[in-house]
Each structure stands twice: as structure tokens, then as C-alpha cells.
Amino acid sequence: RDRAGVGRRHGAAVAEGLANEGMRVVCSDIDGQTAEATAARIGGDAIAVATDVADPAAVEALANQSFDHFGQVDVLFNNAGVFQGGLAWERSLEDWHWTFGVNVFGIIHGIKYFVPRMIAQETDGHVVNTASVAAFVAGATSGPYVVSKCAAFSLSESLALDLGAVGSKIGASVLTPSTFDTGIAKTARVRPSHLGEDKTPDGLVVAEYLQKQLDSGMPASEAFTPFINGIRTGEFLIPTKPSYADQIRNRYEALLKRQIPGQLVPD
């Protein structure tokens, strides 16, 4: 059993929940010490592997270590993510590349190096990719993040359809967190040093606003229940709250009217 991006918050909660279900867990995070701390809390057979999911060689090494250590992988959770806010035209190309490198190519790398081997096992399994409610309901001053999460959602759709087309026993779902404490607003800690610190007013304002919303949201410890229930029931879309259904519906109604959808309104 394997997961990617489990060092903090809801990733760690899901890792611990899977372990409680009797699964052997590989904890992966760009911060090796954080991954090791999660593995230590889990105990038993859990192992930690420091991995930058934006680096294909690192994800390939993660896959090799996971399969070599446990023999097979049944659940893959592509969860690593970063937040980059700000006005679309104010963001540097490097900001866009960094955001997509983790939020989109991190998932692509996981699919590339894990899924073929999971299919070859000819056993039941599941891939869960983390997108966001922002994939449906966007907001201003969050362009890189929102666009990357839309891509993550579409990538998950393509994966699910491809797996179905070949008759695979592997299922695919997309987790769409809303306002709960994912830690996504504090990803400046893993921002590459060559990008420098983001001190632009547009970026700082939206990051501060996002953190306030997350602080008042549901605790990360509640992430596991929708995650495991979604896998068990074969749901493609795994929301962490049902309360965004109306906003999702409003989005598509606006599009049918050829209008710009409204912004996300936290509840």
C-alpha cells in the first residue's frame, strides 16, 4: 500500500487511517523528517521516503522502493500540493512551473511509475488524486492554484476512463477538499529557494485570506472518513463536504448561460 504527500495534516490523517485498516503504509513527503515522524506515529511496517514529486526520477525511486519493500501497491494517494496565489499576470513563469510541477506533474509522475505495475498485479486497487473544490468553483487572485487543480481533476477523469477502457481492476477517484485544515496555505516552506520569497501584495493577501478560511474549517483528522468511504463505494468524486453541491450546480448553470461562474463562497 502506498501514498504520496503524507507528511502533514489530512495526508497524515489518511495515512494513519489506512494503517488502522490493516494496510502497510509508505509515507512520502518532500520533507523526509516529517514523513519519518508520520511513519513513527503509525509504527509497525510503515516506512518513510523523502520524495519531491515534481522530480520524475524521485517518484520512480519511490515506486521502486515501495514495490521492493512490500511486493505490491494497492492504494496510491497522489496528495502532494502547493498553493500559489496572486493575479494571473503578476505571477512569474517560474511560479506557474512550480505550481504545476507539484500539483499536476506530481500526479502524472505517480501515474507513470505506479499504475502500470498496479495493473500488472491483476488485483483490486485504487488511485486517489487530490484536486480541490477550486476545480469547480474558482476565485480571483488564485490563478496558478485554481488552474492546476482543474488540470488535476481532468487528469483524474482521464485516468478513470482509461482504466475502465482496458478493463483494469484498478479504480480512480479525485478528492476535492474544501475548507478544512490541509496546510495548503503554508506551502511557502517548500517554495524553491531560486524563486525567492513571495512578498508581492496580491500573493500575500490571498494566502492570508485562505489561511483564515482553513483555520475555521473542519479539522484534518476528519479527512479519512470520506476518503475510505469513497474508495469502498467506488465514487469518482470524493468531496470532504456535501455543502458545495449547490455552488457546483450554480457553476454549470452559469456556463450553460454563457456567463462567468460565481466565486467560491465558504460556508
Q: Which stretches of residues belong to each language-model region?
A:
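Canonical Rossmann dinucleotide-binding motif of NAD(H)/NADP(H)-dependent dehydrogenases/reductases
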Residues: 1-26
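Substrate-binding pocket helix/loop in short-chain dehydrogenase/reductase
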Residues: 87-88, 95-97
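Active-site helix of classical SDR
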Residues: 111, 148
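Residue(s) in the substrate-gating loop at a strand-loop-helix junction
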Residues: 132
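SDR active-site lid
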Residues: 165-237
